[in-house]
Amino acid sequence: MATERTLSIIKPDATRRNLTGKINAVFEDAGLRIVAQKRVQLSEAEAGAFYAVHKDRPFYGELVSFMVSGPVVLQVLEGENAVLKHRDVMGATDPKKAAPGTVRAQFAESIEANSVHGSDSLENANTEIAFFFAQTEILP
């Protein structure tokens, strides 16, 4: 098993309801370690650039608007097989299909306001982490 790092974003629907601590506890209970974390207000340019891969999808505009609707918590999580473990702990994108105990089953309001984002591959994790964090902001 390899120690990996992945990007996690606690989205505006969750920060608005002060769920950061509860979500962090789910991650940590699953064996993921928070090695960087910051609470920020994304600009439209930042959110648009981050989600540029979805630019041609019908939900892109709404996604960008949602991601700038309030503060987000950006995190780098570390652990054994962190990318897959984080995705398992987040649960299905649609909270109605998310397994009990997952972040989305517990906290998501809808498929759009689903509380968290997580990298979908190790390659994307590295790209996404570098988008938001300087190496000096991440614990060794």
UniProtKB/Swiss-Prot annotation:
InterPro entries in alphabetical order: NDK-like_dom, NDK-like_dom_sf, Nucleoside_diP_kinase, Nucleoside_diP_kinase_AS
> One Pfam family for this entry, by name?
NDK
EC no.? 2.7.4.6
Which Gene Ontology molecular-function terms are recorded? ATP binding; metal ion binding; nucleoside diphosphate kinase activity
Mind telling me which residue stretches traverse the membrane in this protein? Answer: none
Which HAMAP family does the entry link to? NDP_kinase
- Protein family membership: Belongs to the NDK family.
What is the name attached to this protein's record?
Answer: Nucleoside diphosphate kinase
Record the organism: Gluconacetobacter diazotrophicus (strain ATCC 49037 / DSM 5601 / CCUG 37298 / CIP 103539 / LMG 7603 / PAl5)
Taxonomic placement = Bacteria, Pseudomonadati, Pseudomonadota, Alphaproteobacteria, Acetobacterales
